[in-house]
């Protein structure tokens, strides 16, 4: 029952529901690039113009788009085709790495539109996935469009808030993990997206937060909250590099830094808006000799930095001869590395954990000075350079 084609006319022929699932990346100014959706909409419209059908066709926009987009698409289709067409906004809430599970077990299905008949079609379409009636939510186009942006901005704000708290934790000797558990156990807050680190990235959060800023300006509003989310995220990456310089106790020019992790998160090769992009650039700008590794994302990162960075096949060889390690992605295999062996091969066994994913006691016993984010550091490590 599943067919593949690159022919749009063949794809939409006799279709009752047509999904538009094209990308809406950021333009250089931060606004949404709508060209892919506009092209898809026009091609669907041209294909429908050649058909004569006596039933309603529902166009479902899965793409993340600014408020007002679906309404404009509906007006365009109504003018350009004789077919009876309705447009529905149905934003996706899939997490990279667990998209199939999220699709099959949704915690909410948001459907925006103005046609009760289209709502009924969408309800019937999603019926096998609806375990509780309340997860199927209908609203107007603009509400559905803003729901997607608001959700991602809210999640990004939680990360940025915790990242800002790491500064206070470091200043007062608190532990951000204890703070996280303390506030996450509050039922009004919950534990999700409260892990501090060296910044957030990926294909959604940075793009959607930037777009929400532009959407706000379009109605004459300077969204200070959204601006702050972005500012904190950028500052956290700069602060990570500044902390390396501070703890090394000298200018970074000529220092050798090993970077472990290039993907924006573990279990993916996706480097879009990865904190590693900015952190490596900051290091290079300071004259650092950067050697980098990642179990999946290295081939995607190589075209970005080319020969500005030395590429290593594994963390052990990457750290050899380094003045410090910067851990930027929480790959689980980094927890089981031979840290004593690694420490013995480094110029100075210092590790900056941008994901708080390693254990202090293990790092201390391996002879590392260890600097996590917002957690007590290990500065009295055992000197085991002579032991392998």
Regions found by a protein language model. Give the residues of each.
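Structural/interface elements that position substrates and couple domains in central-metabolism enzymes
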Residues: 1-388
């Amino acid at each position: 029952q599943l067919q593949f084609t690159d022919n749009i006319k063949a794809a939409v022929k006799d279709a009752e529901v047509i999904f538009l699932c094209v990308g809406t990346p950021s333009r250089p100014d931060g606004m949404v690039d709508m060209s892919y959706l506009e092209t898809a909409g026009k091609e669907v419209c041209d294909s429908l113009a050649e058909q004569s059908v006596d039933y309603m066709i529902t166009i479902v926009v899965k793409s993340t788009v600014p408020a007002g987009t679906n309404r404009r698409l509906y007006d365009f289709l109504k003018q350009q085709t004789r077919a009876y067409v309705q447009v529905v906004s149905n934003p996706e809430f899939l997490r990279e790495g667990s998209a199939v599970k999220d699709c099959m077990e949704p915690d909410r299905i948001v459907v925006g539109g103005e046609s009760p008949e289209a709502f009924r079609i969408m309800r019937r379409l999603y019926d096998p996935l609806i375990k509780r009636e309340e997860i199927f939510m209908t609203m107007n186009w603009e509400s559905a469009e803003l729901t997607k942006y608001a959700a991602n901005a809210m999640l990004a704000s939680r990360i940025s808030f915790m990242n800002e708290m790491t500064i206070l934790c470091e200043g007062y000797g608190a532990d951000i993990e204890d703070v996280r558990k303390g506030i996450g156990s509050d039922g009004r807050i919950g534990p999700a997206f409260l892990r501090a680190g060296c910044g957030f990235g990926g294909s959604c959060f940075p793009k959607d937060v930037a777009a929400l800023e532009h959407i706000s300006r379009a109605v004459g509003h300077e969204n200070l909250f959204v601006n702050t989310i972005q500012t904190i995220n950028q500052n956290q990456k700069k602060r990570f590099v500044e902390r390396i310089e501070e703890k090394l106790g000298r200018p970074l020019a000529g220092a050798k830094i090993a970077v472990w992790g290039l993907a924006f998160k573990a279990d993916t090769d996706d480097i879009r808006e990865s904190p590693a992009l900015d952190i490596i650039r900051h290091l290079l700008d300071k004259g650092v000799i950067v050697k980098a590794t990642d179990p999946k994302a290295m081939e995607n990162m190589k075209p970005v930095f080319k020969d500005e960075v030395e590429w290593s096949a594994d963390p052990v060889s990457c750290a050899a001869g380094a003045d410090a390690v910067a851990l930027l992605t929480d790959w689980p295999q980094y927890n089981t590395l031979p840290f004593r062996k690694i420490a013995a091969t480094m110029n100075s066994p210092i590790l900056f954990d941008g994901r708080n994913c390693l254990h202090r006691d293990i790092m201390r016993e391996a002879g590392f000075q260890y600097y996590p984010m917002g957690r007590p550091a290990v500065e009295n490590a055992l000197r085991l350079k002579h032991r392998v």
